[in-house]
């Protein structure tokens, strides 16, 4: 096993003349839940897309289990990915969507039922995806991310569209995954919710402002992740 589940080393990404992220470096330990935080336009989605090979960095590299995403023999076994804004084919059922994902991942036939149960969609498996609420679609995205039984999850705004019960469910889901030895890198604006579940945080605003343990950032009961986050991002110029 490589030392880190995820490692980002000096990643810079430009889109033409626009600098999206600048010399980002951080590592995500095995068995941890790490929150990736930053204001809109800070480069969170760019960073996640670079890690999973959807974007090529201008310089630097990103590794999963010590290798670039493109070098993983069967990526779905190593990492499950759920990105905000990635849609589904609305005319097919949830089960069919997961069957397609299962075939692509080379997962056993029974895996679809397992992930449907894990995300609470068993009773809705035969519904067409276009009838799903935003929260149900989020759960379906998580189910697809789990289909290959990966050791690592990379999630972009998984709480979007979830009601309070759904957010509580998501918190439990992430904890259970980590307790089984899994690793999670999650980008979210839900700071209060993240504070209850993450072990470490990475705050970026095109570059890394903080990367480390939550307890090293929030050092007293009088502080919160939200207050320390705003101290960091409002104290920088871009």
Give the location of each predicted region.
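H-loop (His-switch) and adjacent beta-strand-loop-beta switch element
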Residues: 201-213
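Catalytic Walker B motif of ABC-type/P-loop ATPase nucleotide-binding domains
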Residues: 153-157
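Conserved ABC transporter NBD signature motif
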Residues: 60-75
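Helix-to-loop junction immediately C-terminal to a conserved catalytic motif
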Residues: 52
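Helical segment within the ABC ATPase nucleotide-binding domain
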Residues: 167-180
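Conserved ABC ATPase "signature" region
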Residues: 99, 103, 109-124
